[in-house]
Curated annotation (Swiss-Prot):
Transmembrane parts of this sequence: 238-258
Principal location: membrane
Name of the featured protein: Short-chain dehydrogenase/reductase prx4
Enzyme class: oxidoreductase
Organism for this UniProt entry: Penicillium roqueforti
Record-annotated active site: Y194 (proton acceptor), K198 (lowers pka of active site tyr)
Membrane topology, from the record: Single-pass membrane protein
Pfam families according to UniProt: adh_short
Glycan-carrying positions: N91
C-alpha cells in the first residue's frame, strides 16, 4: 500500500478582505498547518528497487537504508568510510566515494548501475566560526575553510544531477530526496553558513519541483531539527532532552526520508507557469517534512498557499504571469 497524505488542519485567521487587491487574479490561500502520521508499516514493498544514499554509512542515511532494506530494496551506500560492523543491512553494498569529487560520484553511480531512489544525505557541520577573525602566520586574515559548502551544497547538487541523469536515461521515473535542515527555515545563529546552505537546498527542491515531473521524477526534502547522529552526539543532545526539548532519533528522520520517496499526494504544492490544475493526484513532490522530536510537519504547501500574504497579492500575480510567459515546457 502506497502511503497517502492525510492532513490534520489547523485554521489560521486571516483578514483577507484587507489584504486582497481586487484587480489581482490569484486565489485566496488555503491556510492550514499539516501534520503527518508516518509509520513504517505503511511503507510499500520495494522489491526490485535500487536505492543510492550519500552519507549512507551512519546516522540518518544508515537509518533510512535499513528501512528501505526491510521493504525489499537493494541499497548502495556512498560514503568515505564503511558502516560499523553489523550495522548495514544485508542487501546493501558500500561504495567508497567522496561526494565533493565528480569523478568519484560518477564512478559510484556507474557501479550501482541503476537508480530508482536517490537520497542526497551526506553533510558536515560548520567547521569554524565563519565570521570571527582568524589569522595566518603572517598575521593576515585567514581564508575560511569551505568543506561545509563543498559537501553540503556542491556535493548535493552533483549527486542530484547524476541521479536525475540516470533516471531520465532509464525512462522509468524515480525519486530524489534531499536531507536539508530545520535551520533552512529557522536559521541557527551559531551556524550561519550551514543554515544558509540548507536554505539553498530547500530552494533547489522548489526550483526543480515543476520540471522533474515531466520525467516522472519527484524531488523532496526532509528538514531535521535536533537529531542524535555524529553531528549531534548524545552528550550534546542529552541536555536538550533533559530540558524537555524535542530531539529526534535517526530512525525518525530516516522514516521521513523513505516516506518522501514513496508517498503520493492529492494535490500539488503549487502551480507554476502555464499550469492551472492544483488538485492533481500524483507522486509526493516538491515538499519538505520537518522532523521535530517525534512530530512530522509538511512545510511547503502552507508556505505556497500563503504566498500572496507574505509576498504580496500583486507581486504574486505579476510574478506568476512572468513565469507563465517564460515557461519553456
Amino acid at each position: 500500500m502506497i502511503p497517502r497524505w492525510q492532513p490534520a488542519s489547523i485554521p489560521l485567521l486571516l483578514h483577507l478582505d484587507t489584504l486582497r487587491c481586487h484587480h489581482v487574479s490569484v486565489q485566496p490561500p488555503r491556510a492550514t498547518m499539516t501534520s503527518l502520521n508516518i509509520k513504517e508499516e505503511d511503507i510499500p514493498r520495494l522489491d526490485g528497487k535500487v536505492v543510492v544514499i550519500s552519507g549512507g554509512a551512519s546516522g540518518i542515511g544508515l537509518a533510512a537504508a535499513n528501512i528501505f532494506a526491510r521493504a525489499g530494496a537493494k541499497i548502495f551506500l556512498f560514503d568515505c568510510n564503511p558502516p560499523d560492523s553489523g550495522e548495514a543491512p544485508e542487501n546493501s553494498t558500500f561504495i567508497k566515494a567522496d561526494i565533493t569529487s565528480w569523478a568519484e560520484l560518477k564512478a559510484a553511480f556507474a557501479q550501482a548501475g541503476h537508480v530508482d531512489i536517490a537520497v542526497a544525505n551526506a553533510g558536515v557541520s560548520e567547521e569554524q566560526p565563519y565570521f570571527e577573525d582568524t589569522f595566518d602566520e603572517q598575521g593576515e586574515l585567514k581564508e575560511p575553510g569551505f568543506a561545509v559548502v563543498d559537501v553540503n551544497f556542491k556535493g548535493t547538487v552533483m549527486f542530484t544531477k547524476l541521479a536525475v541523469s540516470y533516471m531520465r536515461k532509464q525512462g522509468k521515473g524515480g525519486s530524489v530526496v534531499i536531507t536539508a535542515s530545520a535551520t533552512g527555515y529557522a536559521p541557527e545563529q551559531n551556524l550561519p553558513v550551514y543554515s544558509a546552505i540548507k536554505s539553498g537546498l530547500v530552494g533547489l527542491v522548489r526550483s526543480l519541483r515543476s520540471t522533474l515531473p515531466r520525467f516522472d521524477i519527484s524531488i523532496n526534502a526532509v528538514a531535521p531539527a535536533a537529531t542524535i547522529t555524529k553531528l549531534l552526539p548524545m552528550d550534546i543532545a542529552g541536555p536538550l532532552m533533559a530540558a524537555g526539548l524535542p530531539v529526534s532519533s535517526a530512525h525518525m528522520v530516516g522514516l521521513a526520508v523513505v516516506y518522501s520517496a514513496v508517498a503520493r499526494q492529492p494535490r500539488m504544492v503549487e502551480t507554476y507557469g502555464k499550469e492551472n490544475v492544483l488538485d492533481l493526484e500524483s507522486k509526493w513532490n516538491g515538499r519538505t517534512i520537518l522532523t521535530l522530536g517525534e512530530h512530522y510537519t509538511e512545510l511547503e504547501e502552507k508556505l505556497a498557499d500563503l504566498r500572496p500574504v507574505w509576498f504580496g497579492w500583486r507581486n504574486t500575480d505579476l510574478t506568476k504571469k512572468q513565469q507563465a510567459t517564460a515557461d519553456f515546457r
